[in-house]
Each structure stands twice: as structure tokens, then as C-alpha cells.
Swiss-Prot record:
Residues at which substrate binds: 15, 42, 109, 132, 186, 291, 385
Species this chain originates from: Desulfosudis oleivorans (strain DSM 6200 / JCM 39069 / Hxd3)
This protein's UniProt keywords: Aminotransferase, Pyridoxal phosphate, Transferase
The protein's name: LL-diaminopimelate aminotransferase
GO biological process, one term: lysine biosynthetic process via diaminopimelate
Metabolic or biological pathway: Amino-acid biosynthesis; L-lysine biosynthesis via DAP pathway; LL-2,6-diaminopimelate from (S)-tetrahydrodipicolinate (aminotransferase route): step 1/1
Function: Involved in the synthesis of meso-diaminopimelate (m-DAP or DL-DAP), required for both lysine and peptidoglycan biosynthesis. Catalyzes the direct conversion of tetrahydrodipicolinate to LL-diaminopimelate.
Record-linked NCBIfam families: DAPAT_plant
Length: 409
């Protein structure tokens, strides 16, 4: 008799964004004439940068002739892209990251979800609340949690992020082996200072713990004093793995390209206490389960680092941040408290009511889709996340609709 992994049964019935889509589709079926403006899921809406598109076309043409055709590529990524990532995203900021420490993949979601496979099932995991659901759900699937009761799983260290601590998770007082951090944060939009991250690195060094650092939204940081990578922090190479994506920085949500950075001195330990390099373990896992990102996509990603690509990507970010500015101004005008939107495409809005109820009200009365904060954890129960990923015209229209429903302060 074939048996299932019963840990899957502990998962909540529906992935957050699937539930949102279900409710939106049901509403549209009964209100076909109402236009819907989606400020929910963080999907890019601007087209690929022209520099990326040109490189993409050229690489596709190369695949059409025998002399330049490419078959299977290196699982870890082509050297040209790994070198561009290391030089531009890390070495240019004084971070000592080498090309062979960069692993190209098809998404940060996949990497953040898969990296936990390297660790024992009896480790203690610390996760922020609210949190991007993938961090938690993949550890549930792996069997690291207890049952789901009163809105939380057993055996997880929940780090509450509230207005009282500026939505910055505090170092846990109880033991933890694996910690997930995301800055600029999804969903709250909060950012971390160098001093704050240094405290985390120092803690991890002392505890022999590991930080999984999601920096997918670093391109939205507008203050040069805010770190864009955890490797700007002394000691981080020993205790942190970083994940990034081209999805939001260059519009690759439908094209799929990202990368993880695993420094060679970053260690984890066996039951005898012997240290093992995570770089070697991740390389083994990566080569076993992944066949690499396609050559044309990697050439398109490489073009992000060209002078033209950098300028075009910055303009794309500027467009989204203009949307964020419009949203934050509207929230202030309507009297809502919020965080984010200054260095992030996400705005975390305090609704003072149940987030799913607010979602339904916003959808039915204004035709605007948000993301209910309750889907990110108990601490998000009265918040919604608004996304700046749309056209300015749509964002402006959505804010006007919201003002009609909720009024102006």
C-alpha cells in the first residue's frame, strides 16, 4: 500500500494566493460588469527591459543554428551570469562573493523553499509573523512542526512583528537553529539597518545557527545607508545564505530567473558536531534535482547588468515606487496607519478589523483586490498588503475608489 507524507495533511486547505484568486473569480462571475483592479499578488506588470529583450532574442536566434546551439548547460548557471551577479550585486558593494558561490535558479520561491532540505527534521526553526507563506509551509511539509492549533504550528519559534517593534523580529530568547529573515520585508515593507543585521549575525555566530536571508526586493531600497545584502555585514559569510530574484527588479516573473548565494565557509553540523560546508551540500542537491535555467533566459538576465539594462531596470523600479508613493499618500489621507512603501513595493495597512472581512469589503464595494494580512500569520490578522505592481493609472483609480468607500481623513 502506497502511503502519503502525512505532514502534508497539516497544511492549511489552500495556499493564500490561490484562495484570493478563488474569491476574485467568484465575485467576477456574479458581477461581470465591474472592473477589477488587482493590488494583491506581487506580480510584475511592466514589460521586460529592452536590453533584456534584445539579449533574449539574440540568444534564441543562437539556438536556431547548429554552430551556436546550446544543449544542457551547467546546473549552477553559466559562468557569464554568475560572474555578472558576483561583480555587480556583491563585489561592487564591498561584499566578498565569488562567482562559484552563486547558484542560478528559476525562482527565489523555489530556492527558499528547497534549501531547508539540507537540514535535519529535528532542528528548531524561527520564522517571523507575519511571513511569506513558503518559509513556513515547506517546513511543515518536511515534518519540522507540530499540529496547527489556534492559528499556529507547534515546534516553530514565531518572531512577532508588530507596530510596537517597528515590524522587526527580535532575536528569539529560546533556542533556534534556522532563522528566516526578509528585507525589505514581504509583506510589511520594513527595512533593516546594518546595526540590526549585525546583531543577528553575531547571534548566529554564537549559536552556530543559520540565517536564510531573502533579499528579493533589495532593488527598491532608496536610502544608500540601508544594506542591500547581508554580506555587507562582517561575519555574515559564515552564517548566512542569501536569495535574490530578477522577477521584481527586471520583470522576470514570467521568464523565471533567480539565484542563491552560498559562501564556502558557511557551515552546518552533523550529530557528532562535525562541520560540513553548505556550499558542497547545496551543489549536490542542485545538480541532482535541477537541470539549470535555459540559456536564452540567462542571457536576458545577464543584460540586466549592462549599462542600458541597469538604467532601464532603475526606471522600472522608479515607476513602481511612484505607485507606492501614490498608495501611501492615499492611505494617509484616508486615516489608515501603514508601514512600507518607502523602500518596498508593498504597503502594510492597519485596517483595525479582520483582514479577510476587509478584503471582501474592498473587493465588493470598490472592485479592488488586496492581500489579507491574516494569510501571512496571526500578527497580520487586522492588516492588508497593497502592492505597487500595476500601472500608475490603475493605482490612481484604485485609490480614488477606496476614498469613495472609506472617505478622507
Amino acid at each position: 500500500m502506497i502511503k502519503i507524507n502525512e505532514h502534508f495533511l497539516k497544511l492549511q486547505s489552500s495556499y493564500l494566493f490561490s484562495e484570493i484568486a478563488k474569491r476574485v473569480n467568484a465575485h467576477q462571475a456574479t458581477h461581470p460588469d465591474q472592473s477589477i483592479i488587482k493590488l494583491g499578488i506581487g506580480d510584475a506588470t511592466q514589460p521586460l527591459c529592452p536590453a533584456c529583450l534584445d539579449a533574449f532574442h539574440k540568444a534564441v536566434d543562437e539556438m536556431g543554428t547548429a554552430s551556436s546551439f546550446r544543449g544542457y548547460g551547467p546546473e549552477q548557471g553559466y559562468a557569464f551570469l554568475r560572474e555578472a551577479v558576483a561583480a555587480n550585486d556583491y563585489q561592487a558593494r564591498g561584499a566578498d562573493i565569488q562567482p562559484d558561490e552563486v547558484f542560478i535558479s528559476d525562482g527565489a520561491k523555489c530556492d527558499t523553499g528547497n534549501f531547508q532540505e539540507l537540514f535535519a527534521t529535528d532542528i528548531r526553526v524561527a520564522i517571523p509573523d507575519p511571513v511569506y507563506p513558503v518559509y513556513l509551509d515547506t517546513n511543515v511539509m518536511a515534518g519540522r512542526t507540530g499540529a496547527f492549533e489556534n492559528g499556529r504550528y507547534g515546534n516553530i519559534v514565531y518572531m512577532e512583528c508588530t507596530a510596537q517593534n517597528s515590524f522587526l523580529p527580535a532575536i528569539p530568547k529560546e533556542p533556534a537553529d534556522l532563522v528566516y529573515l526578509c528585507f525589505p520585508n514581504n509583506p510589511t515593507g520594513a527595512v533593516a539597518t546594518k546595526e540590526y543585521l549585525q546583531a543577528w549575525v553575531d547571534w548566529a555566530l554564537d549559536a552556530k545557527a543559520l540565517i536564510l536571508f531573502d533579499a528579493a526586493y533589495e532593488a527598491f531600497i532608496r536610502d544608500p545607508s540601508i544594506p542591500k545584502t547581508i554580506y555587507e555585514i562582517p561575519g555574515a559569510r559564515k552564517v548566512a545564505v542569501e536569495f535574490r530574484s530578477f522577477s521584481k527588479t527586471a520583470g522576470f516573473t514570467g521568464t523565471r530567473c533567480a539565484f542563491s548565494v552560498v559562501p564556502k565557509e558557511c557551515m552546518a553540523y552533523d550529530t557528532s558536531g562535525k562541520a560540513h560546508a553548505l556550499h558542497a551540500l547545496w551543489n549536490r542537491r542542485h545538480c541532482t534535482k535541477f537541470n539549470g535555467v535555459s540559456y536564452p533566459v540567462q542571457r536576458a538576465a545577464e543584460a540586466v547588468y549592462s549599462p542600458e539594462g541597469k538604467a532601464q531596470a532603475k526606471e522600472m523600479i522608479r515607476t513602481y515606487m511612484a505607485n507606492a508613493d501614490r498608495i501611501t499618500a492615499a492611505m494617509a489621507g484616508m486615516g489608515f496607519s501603514y508601514v512600507g512603501g518607502d523602500h518596498s513595493p508593498y504597503i502594510w495597512v492597519d485596517t483595525k478589523t479582520d483582514s479577510w472581512a476587509f478584503f471582501d469589503t474592498l473587493l465588493t464595494k470598490a472592485g479592488v483586490v488586496c492581500t489579507p494580512g491574516g494569510g501571512f500569520g496571526k500578527c497580520g490578522a487586522q492588516y492588508i498588503r497593497l502592492s505597487a505592481f500595476n500601472s500608475y493609472a490603475n493605482v490612481d483609480a484604485a485609490m480614488k475608489r477606496m476614498a469613495e468607500v472609506f472617505g478622507k481623513a
